[in-house]
Regions:
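Intrinsically disordered, low-complexity regulatory segments
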Residues: 2-168
Length: 168
């Protein structure tokens, strides 16, 4: 057999797209009959209803609309999913980076362990500490070594070396 890994989608968006397809079929039954009962609907129209996968753990879909459309059109491709983060300002110019959403199917404990290993191996020179302050919501606190570190540069480094960015 053939293996597949289809990302999760929003059920409401899928239902809206199906209703639209049914409406198109009702409006022109003769044309629908000529196409074997399947109405011809442009990909761009369907993308208005289904803009992309909807991951239950959140995260940011880091793909262009064109890449998503191509993956849907061909049935091939993958999506880059990144953790969502925000920069929390502290006093005296200090800041922490707070990860609030994880990529789909990434285990938080393994991610923390991997970041700790990289810190021990001195492969993350700009990161001083990582703390898991999660309760019901995800809250990973990344503490930079100094306030001169660019938070976006630090996150890019983490995206490259850890599962804070994955391909699905």
């Amino acid at each position: 057999g053939m293996a597949t890994n289809i990302p999760p989608h929003n059920v409401g968006e899928l239902c809206d797209a199906l209703i639209h397809m049914a409406d198109v079929r009702k409006k022109d039954p003769k044309k629908a009959k000529q196409t074997g009962g399947r109405p011809e609907i442009l990909d761009a129209t369907l993308l208005k209803y289904i803009p992309g996968p909807d991951f239950p753990t959140g995260g940011i879909l880091a793909e262009s609309k064109e890449a998503i459309a191509e993956a849907y059109r061909t049935g091939r491709g993958s999506f880059r999913v990144r953790a969502r983060y925000e920069v929390e300002k502290l006093d005296r110019g200090q800041f922490d980076i707070i990860v609030t959403e994880m990529p789909y199917q990434v285990q938080k404990a393994k991610l923390i362990e991997r970041i700790a290993e990289l810190m021990e191996a001195r492969k993350l020179p700009f990161l001083a500490d990582i703390r898991d302050e999660s309760t019901e919501d995800v809250r990973l606190v990344l503490e930079p070594k100094s306030r001169t570190v660019d938070p976006d540069m630090l996150m890019e480094q983490l995206f490259r070396q850890t599962d804070l960015e994955i391909r699905f």
